[in-house]
Every structure is written in C-alpha cells, then in structure tokens.
From Swiss-Prot:
Compositional bias annotation for Low complexity: 517-528, 930-960, 1401-1414
Annotated family: Belongs to the COG1 family.
Parts forming coiled coils: none
Regions of compositional bias (Polar residues) in chain numbering: 1305-1322
Protein name (Swiss-Prot/TrEMBL): Conserved oligomeric Golgi complex subunit 1
Keywords per UniProt: Golgi apparatus, Membrane, Protein transport, Transport
Species the sequence originates in: Dictyostelium discoideum
Length: 1449
C-alpha cells in the first residue's frame, strides 16, 4: 500500500508541477497551490534563512534533487519560525488565491460581461418568479447531475488522482503534527538557551558553546539535506524507470542506500531524536527496497522488447539495463553476457523474424543482417576485454601498488572469496595456454586456436569509439572507453562508496558526507559497503574475463539463430517464391547484403583521425540518432565522480597506418564467422528451396492426366495405325512419313510435344538461377566514366573491389540442381507407371462386371484404351532412351543449349522433327570402318531383342560411352515403362485373340465335318501304281475309289485322291482378323516379343479348341463323333475321313504360317531342351509383366468364385458345406493342373502345336495319311506362297520362303486342275510312265524383299495401276471340265476377303447370293470402290488374287 500510495502521489504531484511557475527565494519559501511536493513539509523543512533558490524551468525535468543544493549554508533548526509565521504564510496564501480569482475575472472580455448582464436582465423581465424558480431548479438539477457524472468519471478513470488527494490530506496532517512538534522544540530550545546563556561563565565558554552550536547546526543541516533527498528520490526513480534510464536508477538507489545508512548509523542524540519523529524516512526507505526487483523486471523487459521500440535506442540504456542485472540480481559477467545474447535472440525472432510480419523477404533479411551487425558491435564495445588498459581517468593514474592496497578496505571474508576466484582463474588460464600450445592433427581447429591464429591487436581495439554521453537527469557528461560495461561498474563503485560531491552547477566539489559522523567510519563501511564489495568482485571478474568465452558463446549463438532460421522460418519466408527466376532475383539481393560485410564499420575511426568529438558524434549519431548530445535542462543533479571528470581528456595515441576494421573482421574477432559462412548458409537455403521448386514443378506435370486427356480426343487413325499409314498429310508430308516410319500417331506426337514443352519450361526457369554462375564483374568502365572529384572516384573504386572479390564465392551448385531434376523426373515417371498400371488393372477387374447389353461397347473401349497406353508407353521410353539430355538422364548435359534454345517458346515444327526423328531405335554403337552387311546388322538387333531392323543412331547422342553409363543408371525406370508397355500389350493380345478364338470355336463346332459331298469341290489327283506284272487292287474306301478299266484317263493301276483347293474360310477369316488387329500396331515398330506372345496365345487357344473338339470322338469305318457339353447341352459332331483331312490341312496351314519350317508334323517328335529363339520369349521384363497379368487374372477369378460360393452357401443347407469344400479343393487342383499345363505348353510352343496336329492325325489311317502327306505339304507350300503377303505379320519372325515349282501337264493335251497341282496318267503303248511336260509359273518371289533392311514396302501408284490393268485384261473363260472347281474357288476367295470376323456369316451369305452378278475384273477395277480401301492387308489380298489368276492362266 505504501508503495502504491507513493506511486500515485508522484503522479498527482506531476499534474501540480505542470501548473507551478516558480519558487521564490529569500527568507521564507512561498509555495503556491500548484507547487511541487508536500506544502506543509516544505514549510517546515525549508523556512531556514538562506540564499535564494534557483528557479525551476518549465521543461520536462522532474528531478527533486534541487532541494539538496538549495542553499550554500544552513541555519540551525533553532531559527525555525514559530506558529505565527506559519499563520502568516497561510494568510498570504489566501490573499494570493483571491488575487488569482481577480486575475481570472479580468481575463474575461468586457463585451462578454456586458452581454451576460443584459441576458440576465432580459431573463428576469420576461419570466415570472415561479418560472424563474423552475428554471433555477432545473439548472441546479442539471448541475447536480453533472457533478455526479464528474464524480463517477473521476472515481473510475482518475482513481489515482483521488488517491493522491487523499495522500495529500494525510501528509497535511502529518506536517501539521511535525510543525507543532517543531514549534514546541523551538520554544524549549529557546528556554534552554536562555538558561545556558544565563549561567555562562566567561568568554571562552561562550566561544566553545558557539562552536558546538555551529557544528550541531551543520550536522542538522546535512541531516535535513539527506532527509529531503530520501523523501523526493522515489519520484525521480519512478520517472527514470518509465523512461528506461536504468543507469540513473542504479545511481540514485546506490546513493539513497548510502545516505540512509549514514542517517541510521548517526550517534548524535539530537539527530536520533529528530529521526525518531520523522517516521516518513523509514516509510520511504521501505518503499525503495522494492526498486531492485522492479528494476530487474523492467530491464529484462527492455532487453526483450520489440525492435520497433528499440530502434535508435542509445547504447547507454543497454549499459544501464545490463549493469542492473550485475548490481541487483548478482549475476556474473558470463551470466550477464548469456542474458544479453538470449535477449537479442528473442528480439530477433519475436519482431524481425516473426511469422506474423508481412514485410517482403528482402527487407526481412536486410533487417536481420543489420540486427546481427549491431549485436556484434555491442558485444565488442560492451564486453570485449582489453589486454592493456590505458589510464584515461583520474583514479587510474595511481600506481599498481595503491590498487593492491585497496584490498585492505575489503572484509576478510570477501578477501578469501577473491583469492579463491583468482586461484581458479589462474588454473583456467594455464589450462587454456597448455591447450593452445599443444598441436592437434584434426582438420577443424578449436576456438582457441582460431583466436591465436587471428589475435586482436591493440591498434584495432583503439579504433573502437569512446562513449561520450550526457545524462540530463544527472547533469553530467561521461567519457568511457571500451568495454563500457566495466567503466559503468567503476562508476557504481564510486557512488556506493560516497565519493561524489553535491553541488548546484557541477563546478564546486566537497566531501560533505563525511562530516555527519566522523567516529563511525568502520560501521558505515560495513553496512553500506556490501554493494561496493559485489561491484569490486564483478570488476575483478571483468579484468580476468577471457575473450575465448565470448568467441565460443557468440559462435554458438550465431549457429543457433541460423539453424532456427533454416528449420522454422525459411519455408514461411520463401513460400511466395514459386519459380527459379524469382529465387534468382532474391538470391542476388541477399548476396548484396552479405557482400556489405566488406565495408568498414561506420562507427570506427582510424587512428590517424582519432578525435574525441568526432568518434563520439559518430557513435551517437548512428547508434542512437534519437538522443540529443546536448541537454537543454537546467535542473541540478548529482555530479560525476573523480573518475569521470571532463578535465582529464583521453590521450591521443601516436598516428600509425592501420587498416580500418570491417564488418567481416569484427565478425571473425567476435564469433569466428565471416562473409563466407553466411554465403554458404544461404547457398544451402537456396539449394533447399530450389529442390522444393523442382519438386513442385514436376508434381504439376501430371503425365497420367495428359495421357487421359489425349485419349479422350483420339481419332480413328490413332486407334488403327493402318488408317494413319495410308493417310496423306498435305501440311507436312515429310514429317508425316517420318512419324509413320517410327510408328508415331498424331496423339503420340501431341503427348511428346506437351511433355517436352513442360520439361523445357522447367529448364528455362532454372537458366536464370544458373546464369548467376557466369556473372561478370561489375563494369568498372561505367563507374570510371563519371567525372567526379577524387573522393567519389576512390569510393567507387572501393565499392567495385568489394563486389568483385567474392565472385567465386556465389556460385550455385549446379550438379545438385541437376540431380534434383533427375530425382524428381524419376519420381514423376514412377508415379506415371504406377497409376497407368493401376488403370489397366482396374480395366481388367471391371470388365467382367459389365452388363450384357454394354459388353461389346465396353470391351472395345477397354481394348482401345489399353492399346493406346501400350503404344504411348513404348514411344515414351524409346524417346527417353534416345534423348537422355532432354529427360534429365544425362546430368552433365541437362542444360545443353542445343536442346533448350527455344525452351521459352512453344515447339516449332523443326524442333519437333529433331525430337521425334529417333524414336524407333535405341542408340547403337558407331559403325566400324568396314561396313557390315544388312544380315549382320539384323543378327545384332535380334541378339538385343529389338524388333526394329534400323541401324541409324540418334543425332542427339554423340558420346556413346557416356550414354551407355547413363542408361545403366536409369535402367530401372526405363524398365518400368517397358514393363508397362508389355503389360498393356499382353492384355490387348489376350482380349482380341480370345474373342476371335471363341468365334473360331463356334464355327468349328457348327461346321459339318461329315459332309461327303465336299470332295466335289476338291481337286482330284490321280496316283499311278506300279504293277511289275501284277495287278494291285485297291479298296475304294482307301483310295477314294478304283476302276477296273480306263475311265477318263484313269486305268486299273491308278488311285484317285482329293485335296481341297484352299483352306477353310473360317480359318482364313480367323488369321485375317488377327492380322487386322495386329495392323493397329505399326509392324515396323512392333516388338518381336509381342508377336511371339500372339503366336503363343493362338497356339494355346487352338490347343484347347481342338482338344475339346476331338476329346470324345470315336472312329468307325464311316465317321466319328465328338460330344461337346456346354451350358448343360450336348452337341454331337460327326467326322468322316475328308473332314479330318480338311481339319489337318487347316491346322498345318496355320502352323506353317506361324512357325514356318520349324514346325515338325511328326508325332514322335519330342520337345527340344533349348527351343528356337524365334518363338520363345526370353526377355525378363516381359516375364515380369506376364506374371503380373496372371496374378491379376487369378485375383479376378478368385473374387468371382468367392461371390458364387457365397450365393450358394446362402441357398444351400449346412449339410452341404463339406461337399463344397471338396469341390473347391478339386477346382484348385484343376486350376493348378491347367496352369502347369499352360506353363509346360508355353515353354515350347512348336511342340504344343505339333501336339495339336497329332490329335488330328491319330484319327486318320496311317496308310491314308502316307498317301495324303506329300500332297498336303505341296498344297500348304502353294497356299503359303499365295498368302505370304497377307499374313506378313506372322511370317515376320521365321521368314520362311517356299521355292516355286514347275507345272506338269499330260501329253494328251488335257488341262490339269487349277492351283498348279500335279496329275498323272499312263503312257500310250504300255511303256510306263512318261515324263510330264512342265510349265513355268510367274509367281512373285518375296525373298529379296525380306532380306532387305527396309521397315516396310510401300507400293507406288504406277505399280498398283499396272497390276489392276493386268487384272482387267485377264481372260475370263475357263475349260468346262474345271468350271465347278473354279466356281468353288471363287466363292472361297470371296470368303477370304478382309472382313470383320463378327459379321462373317452375314457377309458370306451376301457374297454367295451376288457371286453370279459380279465378275472378277469389276471387283478389282481401278474405278471400283473396293480398290480404294487403304489397308496394307487388303492390298496383300489383291496381290494374292492376282497371283492366283496368273497361275490359273
């Protein structure tokens, strides 16, 4: 309560002081109503006859120290005037009040008073007395309301004024009591003096009494000054705390403590009696005891407050706040130093680097560097010790022996503490010296070794400015050298010892504090010297303070700030940086801030111009621009100590040429961090941000979305490559031909163009950042061209040197940037392959859940999407392999200018041509000097499992050795794309092969294999049997019929067999449909592994179909039957010999198309241990894709089976659960057996197909099979030669060629049957068989075409026109003996046209109805609509028909 009352009373006296004008001097002190302080107390303590007081100015000085120096001499308290004087003073005060009232009235203008009088007169004239009473009552009530409102307002908002007024009332009562006691004392003293004078004897006794009275009077006057100081000083301390003047607070508190100890330890009875009556002194001291705690809290708050308030704060305020911690909280120098660092760190992160700031990052970083610079500068001038102290002050002029004698004034206990401290300090310094002397082999030197390597010279320390500041409250000027904190402690020591003078102008000095009691010096030292002992201990610690501790702790402080900044705030400040261009601009600005470390510290003055005034003005103008160096106040203050007298200037050292201290040097001295350290730190920050920008840029490139968007816009030429192949592009025919050659559809080209543009945009963005590595020095010529004076030219040259020196320090790590790009590209590509694979898996799993009505549409969409994904995957990974620089694989040439010259703009046509030229083949080694043949080149490509026979290398790839290493590093990600391509193709192949195989199965089961009339449309062959003098009778059933006599050229020693003219139409349609599906993929770029898998899928499907067809057949003399069970229905299929012959021919024809000469029809042939490489898939990536597909299919089958089993379990009873488990086990066993069979079959596809043929051959008689075998082989060779071009997709692997044979005819002139088969008859005269005449057929030989390395053969318009003209002029008449066979052949050839297998039956019926209406020339005429079908397969059909007609001719 006492503390709060003093606080409130102080605020009240402030308001009163604003109205005070002056205090008159003279005999009595007249205090006005608005005077400062307690009126009664001032009337009692200051009515002493003295000289006039100095007037108080109206400025903002609130110090009460004027009362301490109010007079030069004081009279005794016996001269205090009596109560009459007090009453006189009171009456004079009342008169003064009335005079003030009259003055206020005189200030009102006369016209206003006249106006008021006239208004009152008019008011009384116009209103009755009752109305006047009502008006009076109304006005009085309003006044009362206003009074109550005013009371509430004052009570709520101005409570401190009310409390202050209450305190004033209490003080009035206490002063009245004091005045009464003093008046009583005065009367008694008068009586005593009268008695003493009455009994005085002699002149000597009178002189002694007079001297004694003077001494007592002097002591009482000193006592009155002390009391006045102690009563008024709390208000001053409060004002100093409010203005953060902690240095003044400490001075006042130490002085108050010293004075209080002087008063309380006084042995004079008169003074003790006076002190017992002045209880306010004790109360004031009790309230002042709280100031240390309050000051500590305020000083810490000041150190940790926001930067907006401490910008421009003078350094003396920091000195006062830090010295408060040493003085009041008893902290050591190290603890104070740590507290300073912690406070600076909190200010930095709470204000400058706060997350709530909205300043640009450039301003934030600039303020951070400025803050760090000022912090290092404060450490340098406040804490950094000097090895040799020069004597600047008076108390340092004494020799060292006198300084050692000061220890006698310190107590024994404290001397023991100091001696122990010094011994420990010596041990510590000796250990440091031993550590520094030992040499270490480590790469990183210790802090001590760093300091030894770069010691601070005395010249550099002398460059630090001398602090020269003036305290307006103390009215003193201080001149301190660094470290300033040590000088401050010395001043506190002098204050605590009472070594200061009381004066009014600062010129007169005197030691009056020793006169109050000359007999108790020891007790005073014991009571008031505790603070001086603590300060002495701190000074000793400061003298032995090691700079290595500053070095180490400051270095840790800088590292902690940088680490917190990197971990917590970098992302916040750099969140708005979205591109490398913005990052490059920010990087250049921040590096400019760091390069300022080369500049000289602006507070430093070189020794040559070491002037006290110039150094002081520089530090005060820069460090504290808001504080004025000259004080305008004139209030009296406590003067400085002997150590801070201005009459002892600092000696100027001898000028020596010394390099000025730069910020870089100061940082290296204090913390060992220089410009390179901050450059490396921010370089790491920029690298982290660059990585974040790269990751964000690549994450925005969603390859899966681009793929899906392009798929939603694909056209027919994208779905079917054959349509795109024959499409003529008028805009860019050259590029169109290149794309067709490389198998690139418009959608593929659009995909590559988009991703190339996006990737090049990323590269172009980072060009701005990487171009900083090639920054030239600042153009010196431009700066030198300025015709300025010499000083400006020197400054320009200096700045240019500073900015050009660290050129090598600001290079960004380009290798890491490239690695980040490579890593991000791998990540995006991995996400693309994963999402695409998941999409294919989803299509497979959802396909079976489609409804029956939408099955066809959904299946087509699914196949189109899967085919599109597989095509795109292959084009993509081929493009990556051929362009490693473009796709970040080659870290050395990612930013090659040849690849990104036009990166900032969209792709031009020429640029896209360069990119897409080399898609078809991976990079090949350069050719040897001796050119290899095409066959050798093709053999090399086959060994590498490449489906392309192109030996062209990519023009972009120049260094093949480096590219091979690059491809090895990036092989896993390329393999993923390749596996995705294989996976899509596997799904696509299984889909369309399964669909067409199902149709073929239906055709096979619906076909009449027991038709005995089929031989009417077959070709007849007569086989002559040699008799050797004996007749050989053959069974008609075995040879197809024998005659005893010669009938139609057939004698009794010959046999007739029939061979079909061509294969079954559904077999041709089956192969044609699959060939059309394959043509959707460019044959030029299709992978051989895909063709092998198509053949494998066809073989497995045929094996299952034929096995089901012949599994239950039974052979008889006439026919055999086969039972098919499907959907609980049984179909009986009957076979005769001709049916088996037809099925055998069809299967052998398919086998020869698929495998060529590798097919072995012998049933005893076993599978080879090492299958042929043409049909076996050895690629491990393909096997991975196939295993994944099988796992997805098994998952789907298991899900379907589980659903069916759940439905059955709900319907069935609990008794049937065991049966269901048995069934499940059986199903699993069957599935495992089927999988094992399929694996065994897939290991050797040729052997599997031979097993299919073996199934049919088992149902034929071996003798019949021996008769038919040679003719079947000849038929298959001829048919294969005709359809070689049609089914080139299958022939592409084995490339088997059948040599053409000559036709044979009978001498009798009878024409042989069509299709160039051989017929024989006997020779006239019975001389045996004559040699038949042969006729050469003009069959085209495609052997040379297959041996070439051409990707595909395009037929010119002239060639096609010649072929169609030959067909148009071909004869249409044929012999009558073969008209039926020709008609059948024409019907079958119409069936073999490239039509859709699904609509096969409808088209077959239409063709049979229109056979007689259409002729062959009209179908193949150039003007016919069918001749304009732009498919490669149908062109092959036309060629085969032409070959058939020429052969028949």
């Amino acid at each position: 309560m006492a503390f709060n009352q003093m606080r409130s009373s102080g605020s009240t006296t402030d308001l009163n002081r604003l109205n005070s004008s002056s205090i008159s001097g003279g005999g009595n002190i007249n205090i006005s109503n608005g005077g400062y302080g307690n009126q009664q107390l001032n009337a009692i303590l200051s009515p002493i006859k003295s000289s006039s007081l100095s007037s108080m100015s109206n400025s903002s000085s609130y110090s009460n120290l004027n009362t301490l120096s109010s007079s030069k001499s004081f009279n005794s308290l016996t001269l205090i005037e009596n109560q009459n004087d007090t009453t006189t003073t009171t009456s004079t005060n009342n008169g003064a009040i009335s005079e003030q009232y009259q003055q206020l009235l005189s200030m009102i203008p006369k016209y206003q008073t006249k106006q008021y009088e006239s208004d009152v007169k008019i008011l009384f004239e116009r209103n009755t007395p009752e109305q006047m009473k009502q008006m009076e009552f109304k006005k009085r009530s309003e006044i009362e309301d206003m009074k109550s409102q005013l009371r509430n307002l004052i009570g709520n908002k101005y409570r401190d004024l009310v409390e202050g007024s209450d305190a004033i009332v209490k003080m009035k009562k206490s002063t009245e009591l004091i005045s009464d006691n003093l008046s009583l004392m005065q009367s008694e003293l008068k009586q005593f003096s009268e008695k003493r004078n009455h009994f005085r004897k002699g002149v000597s006794q009178d002189n002694l009494k007079l001297n004694k009275e003077k001494e007592i009077q002097k002591k009482i006057s000193i006592f009155s000054k002390y009391c006045k100081f102690l009563i008024d000083i709390p208000e001053v301390i409060w004002r100093s705390l409010d203005s953060n003047d902690y240095f003044e607070v400490c001075v006042f508190f130490l002085k108050s403590k010293y004075l209080y100890s002087k008063i309380t330890n006084e042995n004079n009875l008169e003074i003790k009696r006076l002190l017992s009556k002045l209880t306010i002194i004790e109360k004031q001291w009790i309230s002042m005891k709280q100031f240390p705690i309050k000051t500590i809290g305020y000083s810490k708050l000041f150190l940790n407050e926001s930067t907006s308030r401490i910008i421009g704060t003078p350094i003396e305020k920091y000195i006062g706040s830090l010295s408060t911690l040493i003085l009041f909280e008893k902290k050591s120098i190290k603890e104070t130093f740590n507290e300073f660092l912690l406070s600076r760190r909190s200010v930095l992160f709470n204000s400058i680097l706060s997350k709530d700031t909205n300043r640009p990052i450039q301003q934030t970083i600039e303020k951070m560097f400025q803050f760090l610079k000022m912090s290092i500068y404060y450490i340098m001038v406040l804490f950094y010790p000097r090895k040799y102290q020069t004597n600047n002050n008076n108390n340092n002029d004494q020799p060292e022996e006198e300084e050692q004698d000061d220890e006698k004034l310190i107590s024994n206990d404290y001397q023991s503490k100091i001696s122990k401290f010094k011994s420990n300090l010596q041990q510590y310094t000796s250990s440091l010296s031993s550590m520094s002397s030992t040499t270490t082999t480590t790469n990183s030197p210790t802090f001590e070794s760093k300091m030894i390597n770069k010691p601070v010279s005395e010249k550099e320390l002398n460059q630090l400015p001398t602090l020269n500041f003036t305290s307006s409250i103390l009215e003193s000027t201080f001149n301190w050298r660094s470290p300033y904190l040590k000088e401050c402690l010395k001043f506190y020591k002098d204050v605590s010892n009472g070594e200061l003078s009381i004066n009014s102008s600062g010129s007169q000095q005197g030691d009056d504090y020793q006169d109050i009691n000359t007999n108790n010096n020891n007790s005073n030292n014991n009571n008031s010297g505790i603070d001086s002992q603590d300060i002495e201990y701190s000074l000793i610690e400061f003298d032995n303070f090691n700079s290595n501790f500053i070095f180490k702790r400051t270095s840790e402080w800088i590292e902690e700030i940088i680490e917190d900044f990197k971990l917590n705030l970098v992302q916040k400040f750099l969140i708005d940086i979205k591109s490398a261009k913005e990052l490059s601009s920010l990087r250049s600005e921040i590096f400019d801030f760091i390069l300022d470390f080369k500049n000289i510290v602006p507070f430093i003055q070189p020794p040559q111009t070491n002037s006290l005034s110039s150094s002081n003005s520089s530090i005060n103008s820069i460090a504290s621009p808001s504080v004025s160096l000259t004080s305008s106040t004139s209030s009296p203050i406590i003067a400085t100590t002997k150590a801070t007298v201005l009459t002892t200037p600092t000696p100027t050292p001898t000028p020596t040429p010394t390099t000025p201290i730069s910020w870089n040097r100061m940082f290296s001295i204090i913390c060992g961090k220089d410009m390179k350290y901050f450059l490396n730190i921010f370089e790491d920050i920029f690298l982290v941000k660059s990585e974040s920008i790269i990751m964000d840029s690549f994450s925005r490139i969603n390859l899966s979305k681009i793929q899906s968007d392009i798929f939603s816009q694909i056209k027919s030429e994208d779905k079917n490559f054959s349509e795109f192949l024959w499409f003529y592009n008028q805009d860019d025919p050259i590029q169109s031909i290149k794309n067709k050659t490389n198998g690139i559809t418009p959608s593929n080209e659009l995909f590559l163009t988009k991703i190339n543009q996006l990737y090049n945009n990323i590269k172009s963005d980072f060009i701005y950042l990487l171009n900083d590595n090639n920054i030239n020095n600042i153009n010196i010529n431009n700066n030198n061209n300025n015709n300025n004076n010499n000083n400006n030219n020197n400054n320009n040259n200096r700045s240019m040197i500073i900015t050009s020196q660290p050129k090598n320090l600001i290079k960004i790590n380009e290798i890491l940037i490239k690695e980040y790009m490579k890593k991000s590209f791998y990540k995006s590509l991995n996400e693309f392959t994963t999402s695409t694979q998941d999409r294919i898996d989803q299509l497979i799993l959802l396909n079976k859940n489609k409804t029956t009505s939408g099955t066809t549409t959904s299946t087509n969409l699914k196949k189109d999407e899967i085919l599109f994904i597989s095509k795109l995957s292959k084009i993509f990974y081929k493009h990556i392999v051929n362009n490693p620089n473009l796709y970040f694989l080659n870290s050395l040439n990612i930013f090659d200018t040849t690849n990104i010259s036009n990166c900032s703009t969209s792709f031009s046509k020429s640029n896209s041509i360069n990119i897409l030229d080399t898609i078809s083949s991976p990079p090949q080694p350069p050719p040897s000097p001796t050119h290899s043949s095409p066959s050798i080149q093709r053999h090399t490509n086959n060994n590498n499992n490449n489906n392309n026979n192109n030996n062209n290398t990519s023009p972009i790839i120049n260094n093949n050795n480096n590219n091979s290493e690059i491809l090895k590093e990036s092989l896993p990600i390329i393999d993923k794309l390749k596996q995705q391509f294989y996976y899509g193709c596997i799904v696509w192949v299984n889909e369309f092969v399964g669909d067409y195989s199902q149709i073929l199965k239906q055709d096979l089961f619906n076909h009449d294999w027991n038709d005995s009339d089929r031989i009417k449309t077959w070709e007849k062959h007569i086989i002559q049997i040699e008799s050797n003098g004996h007749n050989h009778n053959n069974d008609a059933n075995d040879g197809g019929g024998d005659d005893d006599a010669t009938v139609n050229g057939v004698n009794e020693h010959s046999t007739i067999i029939y061979i079909p003219y061509q294969t079954s139409p559904f077999i041709t349609s089956y192969l044609m449909s699959i060939s059309l599906e394959i043509s959707k993929f460019s044959l030029n770029t299709i992978d051989k592994n895909i063709l092998r898998f198509i053949i494998e899928s066809i073989t497995l499907n045929l094996f299952n179909i034929v096995n089901d067809l012949l599994s239950t057949s039974s052979t008889s003399t006439t026919a055999s039957t086969s039972n098919l069970t499907s959907n609980n229905t049984t179909t009986t299929i009957k076979f005769n010999k001709e049916g088996y012959i037809q099925l055998l021919i069809d299967l052998k024809y398919i086998g020869f198309i698929l495998f060529g000469r590798e097919l072995n029809s012998s049933s005893s042939k076993k599978p080879t241990s090492q299958p042929t490489s043409n049909v076996i898939i050895k690629d491990s990536i393909f096997k991975k894709a196939k295993s994944h597909y099988q796992s997805i299919i098994s998952t789907k089958n298991n899900v379907d089976e589980n659903i069916e089993l759940q439905k059955q379990q709900q319907q069935q009873q609990q008794q049937q659960q065991q049966q269901q488990q048995q069934q499940q086990q059986q199903q699993q066993q069957q599935q495992q057996q089927q999988q094992q069979q399929q694996e065994q079959l897939s290991n050797n596809i040729v052997y599997t197909f031979n097993q299919i043929i073996e199934l049919v051959e088992k149902n034929l008689d071996p003798i019949d099979l021996a008769f038919y075998n040679s003719y079947i082989v000849k038929f298959i060779d001829q048919t294969y030669s005709k359809t070689l071009t049609l089914f080139g997709n299958f022939v592409y692997l084995h490339k088997s060629i059948v040599k053409p044979e000559k036709k044979q005819s009978i001498n009798g002139g009878q024409q042989s049957p069509p299709l160039a088969t051989t017929s024989s008859n006997g020779i006239s005269g019975g001389k045996g068989i004559q040699q038949q005449q042969q006729q050469q057929s003009d069959l085209p030989n495609p052997m040379q075409l297959l041996k070439t390395n051409t990707k595909f053969q395009l037929f010119s318009i002239d060639t096609i026109q010649t072929i169609t003209d030959a067909i148009a002029t071909a004869p249409t008449t044929i012999p009558s003996s073969t008209s039926n066979s020709i008609q059948s052949s024409a019907n079958n050839s119409a069936i073999a046209s490239p039509i859709s297998t699904i609509d096969y039956r409808n088209q077959q019926q239409q063709q049979q109805n229109n056979t007689n209406q259409q002729s062959l020339p009209s179908i193949l005429s150039p003007t016919s609509a069918s001749s304009t079908i732009n498919t490669f397969s149908f062109m092959g059909k036309k060629i085969s028909d032409l070959m058939y007609n020429t052969t028949k001719k």
